Amino acid sequence: MNTKILDQLEFNKVKDQFTEYLQTEQAQAELCDLVPMTNPERIQNQFTEIQEMSEIFVEHHGFAIGSLRDISEPLRRLELDADLNIQELIAIKKVLQASADLSRFYADLENVELIALKRLFEKIEAFPSLQGSLQSINDGGFIEHFASPELQNIRRQLKACDDAIRQTLQDILKKSGHMLAENLIASRNGRSVLPVKNTYRNRIAGVVHDISSSGNTVYIEPRAVIQLNEKITQLRADERHEMARILHELSDQLRPHTAAIANNAWILGHMDFIRGKYLYLHDKKAIIPEISDNQTLQLLNVRHPLLINPVANDLRFDEDLTVIVITGPNTGGKTVMLKTLGLAQLMAQSGLPILADKGSRVAIFQEIFADIGDEQSIEQSLSTFSSHMTHIVEILNTADSNSLVLVDELGAGTDPQEGASLAMAILEHLRLSQIKTMATTHYPELKAYGIETQHVENASMEFDTATLRPTYRFMQGVPGRSNAFEIARRLGLNEIIVKEAENLTDTDSDVNRIIEQLEAQTVETQKRLEHIKDVEQENLKFNRAVKKLYNEFSHEYDKELEKAQKEIQEMVDTALAESDSILKNLHDKSQLKPHEVIDAKGKLKKLAAQVDLSKNKVLRKAKKEKAARAPRVGDDIIVTAYGQRGTLTSQAKNGNWEAQVGLIKMSLKADEFTLVRTQAEAQQPKKKQINVVKKAKKTSSDGPRARLDLRGKRYEEAMQELDAFIDQALLNNMSQVEIIHGIGTGVIRDAVTKYLRRHRHVKNFEYAPQSAGGSGCTIATLG
């Protein structure tokens, strides 16, 4: 794109507005070199970068790259085998540190999905070894002692010599203080000296290095420290030589990585530039426009970026609209509207956010041409018209259907009739060439051209006749009208004169009345649109507020629910643990039988009713939401029917789950238990487990049921297992159990029947249905 348009529209001043948001010299250089692009993919990629940066700022408000120098010159010197100085190495050190920080930031970044920026983050290369080497130079420009063993040794000797000199001079100060002009150790020519009174200069042997301007003080290096000072001078030279060697070594370490370091520096600068674009967008209430795939554009509430408190206007260039002619008197803001359109296009095609509202859309033009100058002076000359025409000729010879043309005061500077005809002919040529054009003019003849010609539309700038001031509001579709009579009347011109003037221009007055009606309709429409926008904004704010309140309420509800559940569960667990502990102690001390333990526990329950969490609808719903994930082997559960805790041990092929509930194994469907989150309980001593079988597919009652299989057992063994099984079932509040004894000789079956008949906690028992085992299985109801 031609660079002339950048000067005409003051694009560099727009770029200067971004400077305050940039931290790195690399970003400043990128901004300086920024020019409009014509590749839609490149432009869209830069818009995507800004959008993704805004998402990063949602999660990390303080995201920043930090202040970094441009290291392109030091890297160039490295490629020429030159050694870098301390400041250049510090600059590279900071770039490497910033690269590592940015890489870590990306690794820790969450809740943000990146596409364009992802490619940049992943191209950053870390150099931990180089960073470690460069730590030998601190940010103050001092080479640390640990940079090399030799440097450390030299500085150790320097300190020893310096301490010896200081001690020697301190001794002289104490002994000969009366001979000194001041009681201090001075320095001259890099050597430690004493300020001796001139009258005593011969009393202290040594070398005179300086005399005060008054001649009263002589600065003498005592003979006792001359040798030490000589050694310090030599050590200083050795130190400089060693530091130069260290700088050379560090430069050699960096040399093979110049390309990668340069790439890191560019990425850091580019990230900083993207950050600056986002901050500009945020501060100026700018937006990222859409890109049209044809040459249509729509700018909503677009503002001129260089004006303070600019008036926002809507502007559109539909596909079937080629030329917009802004007519009307001067000083109304026509030129500003031209520049606003031009700058919006330049900014968008440079990958910058524009000052407009969401929904705005820009086109991509290969070239933008403008002829904009100050034509409002009454002292116009032929040279002005010649210059104007020269520019127009250049534009017409170069522009094509992929261009945007902006012309201010087309045809001005010559005879009005000829100028109007010339302007009309130029606009017609641009229209037939399908070149998007916006032109301003004060020629009334062009109003009719805009009305009568296809693909051409009139526009004007609103003028407030009440205040006699322009409002700078752009009215597309409404031609400009003269306000001379109204202004003259309001300024006090005799009404007779005004009427006479109006009678002389009856035709124009009719046209002006029509235009006035159009203006009124346009203003009314704009007011309605603004009202609709205000309502939309209020609705948006209200929706956000409601959503925020809902989220806060949901969060507090979940917290309180979880807190209540935890407190209740802790109370229940504590009560049960205490009761179990009491019963265990009783059992251990008095050797109570299991059924007596059951009786005792029943009495405890009657004395202090337990909270039945399984019937609490709110908690059940909360648990159901919390346990939305699929159950897994090892999960802690609560059996819904009994409120008992257990652990899932395996899953059967039919989808049911095997669970260990105390000493009993149970077969459960997925809807017969809920998952719970508990701390791992201390392991209890292993106890003999009861062998059980899977539950039959059909039973006489619903819900989970425990089973005992006694088939193949001897009488004594079977009775022991039956007694332990019934006790455990009662302890776990189970209402029904199944005992599989088979038919065989009938010995075990009869023994089971006798046991159940005499057990006080067995309400009733019966054989299972024929389909579930018949007389080979007994179902007992407990209570």
From Swiss-Prot:
UniProt entry keywords in alphabetical sequence: ATP-binding, DNA-binding, Endonuclease, Hydrolase, Nuclease, Nucleotide-binding, RNA-binding, rRNA-binding
Record Gene3D superfamilies: 3.30.1370.110, P-loop containing nucleotide triphosphate hydrolases
Binding locations of ATP: 328-335
CDD domains in the cross-refs: ABC_MutS2 (cd03280)
Swiss-Prot/TrEMBL GO biological process terms: mismatch repair; negative regulation of DNA recombination; rescue of stalled ribosome
SMART domains, per the entry: MUTSac (SM00534), MUTSd (SM00533), SMR (SM00463)
GO molecular function annotations of the record: ATP binding; ATP hydrolysis activity; ATP-dependent DNA damage sensor activity; endonuclease activity; mismatched DNA binding; ribosomal large subunit binding; rRNA binding
All copies of domain Smr, residue ranges: 708-783
EC number(s) recorded for this UniProt protein: 3.1.-.-, 3.6.4.-
Alphabetized PANTHER family for the sequence: OS10G0509000 PROTEIN, OS10G0509000 PROTEIN-RELATED
Function: Endonuclease that is involved in the suppression of homologous recombination and thus may have a key role in the control of bacterial genetic diversity.
Family: Belongs to the DNA mismatch repair MutS family. MutS2 subfamily.
Subunit composition and interactions: Homodimer. Binds to stalled ribosomes, contacting rRNA.
Protein name: Endonuclease MutS2
Lineage: Bacteria, Bacillati, Bacillota, Bacilli, Lactobacillales
Name of the gene: mutS2
